[in-house]
């Protein structure tokens, strides 16, 4: 019996189960460590090793939580928060850390600490008290550090000699954990770092007492006590974050910098070529400074004073780029700079990548060169590149029409590539002995995309058009569904087959589905990204309308512009609701999932980057709010929101619904009890797609026959109301 796409997508967690991920390459290139479940519908992550030192390279599983009798059904609250911030929906082993040689790995399952032998194989539980969060072996593999109850502890790699290194008795003062803003907006999911010599740790101390408390409850279970969380909404105080260096001997020193001027601790790097290095930002994010901490003063004392080694400013904002800063073995600093409308790699301030090559992330740095990812002529594609430290020998290592990521270095490089015309991903290890595949056990999607990459309108907007699988030339006109994200820091119009599967499923129900990336999206240069400064509404919405109009002009008779809907989640949900409120002449219906309706309710780091402080820019916040447009609603609007969402809290949807009710505007609200900003539950994920389809059919007055019957796979206009 065949399984429908909505059910298959839900069971496979959007086809991520069974795919290898989270790669770590041993310093000597002898092995690659990674996570993978045992099948495309198996949600339990296992730890695997590809042994490249064997006569015949082979992979083997070194830790399966089921064999270890590990139970992750009851996660510690801190671990639940970490998984929500990283959008992690799998179970079992979802994260691990290794020593420098990748001989041992540490991980936690259900708060229990395990250590795996990556050479001989096998894993064992350590007899330390829990719950354990974020365990990390020392670089020499002799010890393991971890967080428990907001304190940092260390033990021998066998679990012996457990002792606390840093902590407070106040639950609002935590050590070794990333605060909400760092994890949600800066992609910093950790709060402590081993020194290269394994004798010290740099530990973040987070004081959440200044932060307002919000409460996330479950209205479906009135006996449940709401959970209090420190949520820094725009214009309100952030957590106070500081950094200490703590020795195994108990000695500690605070790293000193001007935290009033540069309060955001965005990243910490502590690797052998360089000093303890911090990346800090001003509150308005127009200044980003790389600091080096002084831990070896002339008189033998550790002052902890930090000096600036690179400072970047911008009148709009300065972006954080993954993988930088880092240090070359000779002490030169690798960073990025925005010059000639290009994000370029720099070495001690000198650009080493050319104009037009938009750097996405640095992967690794050696004296021989730098591995990085970048987009060249097309933001829909990302390739892996290598460049010499002086800018010589620039070389693209993956195809120009793929979406690629990488781990490791030039000697042992893991590449993961996705193609527009091929489901899944291809993972390979490029080693001096040859190229070796890493198996994917992910399920094959039940549908295949019928899509074309487009450039639309005067701005050459990158877009994808998905048509019904059985569409024939001359069929139409088809009802249209716009399916964007459309905002900063994310793309949907990419050269990846699986990124478009849900859009294709809607197309197979009889729609022409258009996915367009407008101004503010990454990959097209700093000016393009910063064109939404001060206004997140006008340009993104105008670009969706322009993409629709240009697509219709390019395909006469294909699109029914009288029946156009739009759907989206998060910023895409905001954009969808915005579309029917401000352009009802274009959009006949909208589905807004987890929409940000009032920018003053969203977090500091994201919102203030684009709109400034609410008390300084009240007009910007008012102009970008959906609440003020409630009386303009004339079209069907479906609002969907998880009531347990702690990122875009349900108050966004509830406040818009209240404003619509007060204005006498009919609308539909679908509350999801127990659901966060993700929708990982199988039944919820499946039925949510089906309910959205029915809403579109009803709102656009479209009848859907069986697939393969009727124009374009079954969508025909109806006169019924």
Predicted regions and their residues:
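Beta-propeller folds
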Residues: 1-396, 401-404, 711-721
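Serine-hydrolase catalytic core recognition
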Residues: 407-721
């Amino acid at each position: 019996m065949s399984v429908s796409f909505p059910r298959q997508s839900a069971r496979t967690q959007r086809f991520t189960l069974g795919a290898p991920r989270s790669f770590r390459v041993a310093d000597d290139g002898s092995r690659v460590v990674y996570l993978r479940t045992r099948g495309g519908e198996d949600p339990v992550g296992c730890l695997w090793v590809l042994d490249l030192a064997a006569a015949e390279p082979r992979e083997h599983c070194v830790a399966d939580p089921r064999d270890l009798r590990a139970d992750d059904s009851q996660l510690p609250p801190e671990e639940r928060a970490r998984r929500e911030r990283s959008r992690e929906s799998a179970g079992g082993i979802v994260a691990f850390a290794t020593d420098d040689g990748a001989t041992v790995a540490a991980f936690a399952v259900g708060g229990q600490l395990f250590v795996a032998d990556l050479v001989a194989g096998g894993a064992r539980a350590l007899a330390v008290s829990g719950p354990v969060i974020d365990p990390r072996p020392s670089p020499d593999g002799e010890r393991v550090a971890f967080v428990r109850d907001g304190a940092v502890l260390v033990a021998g790699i066998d679990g012996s000699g457990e002792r606390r290194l840093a902590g407070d008795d106040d639950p609002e003062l935590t050590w070794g954990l990333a605060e909400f803003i760092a994890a949600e907006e800066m992609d910093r999911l950790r709060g402590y770092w081993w020194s290269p010599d394994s004798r010290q740790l740099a530990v973040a101390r987070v004081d959440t007492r200044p932060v307002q408390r919000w409460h996330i409850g479950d209205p479906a279970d009135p006996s449940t006590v709401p959970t209090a969380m420190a949520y820094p909404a725009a214009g309100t105080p952030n957590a106070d974050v500081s950094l200490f260096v703590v020795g195994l001997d108990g000695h500690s020193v605070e790293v000193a910098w001007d935290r009033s001027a540069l309060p955001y601790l965005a990243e910490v790097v502590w690797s052998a070529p360089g000093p303890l290095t911090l990346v800090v930002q001003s509150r308005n994010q127009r200044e980003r400074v790389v600091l080096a901490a002084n831990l070896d003063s002339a008189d033998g004392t550790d002052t902890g004073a930090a000096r600036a080694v690179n400072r970047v400013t911008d009148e709009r904002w300065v972006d954080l780029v993954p993988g930088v800063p880092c240090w070359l073995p000779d002490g030169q600093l690798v960073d990025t700079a925005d010059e000639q409308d290009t994000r370029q790699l720099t070495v001690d301030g000198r650009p080493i990548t050319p104009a037009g090559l938009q750097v996405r992330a640095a992967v690794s740095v050696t004296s021989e060169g730098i591995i990085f990812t970048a987009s060249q002529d097309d933001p829909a594609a990302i390739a892996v590149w290598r460049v010499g430290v002086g800018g010589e020998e620039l070389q693209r290592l993956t195809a120009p029409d793929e979406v690629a990521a990488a781990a490791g270095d030039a000697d042992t490089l893991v590449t993961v590539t996705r193609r527009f015309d091929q489901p899944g991903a291809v993972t390979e290890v490029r080693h001096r002995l040859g190229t070796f595949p890493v198996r994917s056990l992910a399920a094959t999607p039940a549908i295949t995309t019928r899509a074309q990459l487009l450039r639309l309108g005067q701005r050459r907007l990158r877009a994808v058009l998905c048509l019904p699988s059985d569409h024939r030339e001359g069929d139409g006109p088809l009802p249209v569904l716009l399916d964007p994200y459309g905002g900063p820091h994310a793309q949907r119009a990419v050269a990846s087959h699986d990124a478009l599967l849900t859009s294709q499923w809607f197309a197979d129900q009889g729609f022409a589905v258009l996915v367009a990336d407008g101004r503010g999206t990454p990959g097209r240069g700093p000016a393009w990204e910063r064109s939404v400064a001060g206004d997140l509404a006008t340009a993104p919405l105008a670009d969706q309308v322009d993409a629709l109009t240009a697509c219709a002009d390019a395909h006469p008779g294909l699109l029914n512009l009288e029946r156009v809907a739009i759907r989206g989640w998060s910023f895409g949900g905001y954009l969808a609701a915005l579309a029917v409120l401000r352009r009802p002449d274009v959009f006949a219906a909208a589905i807004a999932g987890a929409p940000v309706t009032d920018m003053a309710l969203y977090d500091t780091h994201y919102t203030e980057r684009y709109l400034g402080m609410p008390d300084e820019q009240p007009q910007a916040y008012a102009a970008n709010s959906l609440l003020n447009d409630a009386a303009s609603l004339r079209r069907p609007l479906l609002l969907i929101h998880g009531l347990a969402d702690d990122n875009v809290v349900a108050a966004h949807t509830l406040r818009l619904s209240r404003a619509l009710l007060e204005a006498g505007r009919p609308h539909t609200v679908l509350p999801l009890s127990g659901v966060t900003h993700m929708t990982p539950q199988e039944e919820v994920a499946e039925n949510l797609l089906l309910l959205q389809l029915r809403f579109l059919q009803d709102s656009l007055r479209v009848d859907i026959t069986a697939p393969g019957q009727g124009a374009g796979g079954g969508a025909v206009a109806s006169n019924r109301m």
